[in-house]
Amino acid sequence: MKKLLLSIVTVLCLGDCFGQKIVDRKNKLTNNVTERFETVIEATKQVKQGIYHAFFDKKIVLVSGKYVNDKKVGTWHYFDRDGTLMQNYDYDNNKLSYEAPEGFPSPLSYDIDYFIKDNDKATPPVRPGGRYFGYLPYLRAFKLPPGMDADYYDRSIVTFDLLISPMGRLADIVVHISRKGTGVDQMVYNISPDLFSADDKIFIPATFNKNPVASQIHILCAMDATGAIDIMYLIAREPAEK
């Protein structure tokens, strides 16, 4: 009888352990970007488990990585919209292992509150996730302001100003909407950092003479006729000067 009971318990345990179903998921992040990943369905939530990919226009790989128990593990690879490798980030050690040189012109620019002399050394802040995919969470938080004339959607430029603390944390976001060619703000509003996950608020801080400092990241975006925005596509002619 004891052997029979033990066998029943073992079978029930195996049934519960192997009853977790792995499901392939696909989500649309923006008009142009979709993500595909595997999840384990638990009682209260979906847990990402396994290979993760994101694609631009359904065919160009933007991201390749792996989740274990909803946590990014190992080295993730991030690409631009042309499929060029932009960044390798080691999530096991929270370390940047590769960052491609930034071309010029670039839709991203950076500021620190220091006058940089010839002998000074400054480095810009870096977003884990690369210079395209890493910034999509902020673009997804964009909302069209009430009263904005739809006739001007595709004539508008949207600029995000991200304030990054010396600790490498997102401190504030200011959104500027202007008409193309004017450089004059038509609307300005803030997006609270509280809207984002802890991972989406992490940066490698800017440095000035090897000391971490506060900085600003400016992201230039274009708006289409539907009111959707994307980081402006600029063809870089050469790496920016260091």
Identify the residue ranges that each predicted region occupies:
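Bacterial Sec-dependent N-terminal signal peptides
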Residues: 1-26, 242
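Charge-biased low-complexity segments
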Residues: 23-242
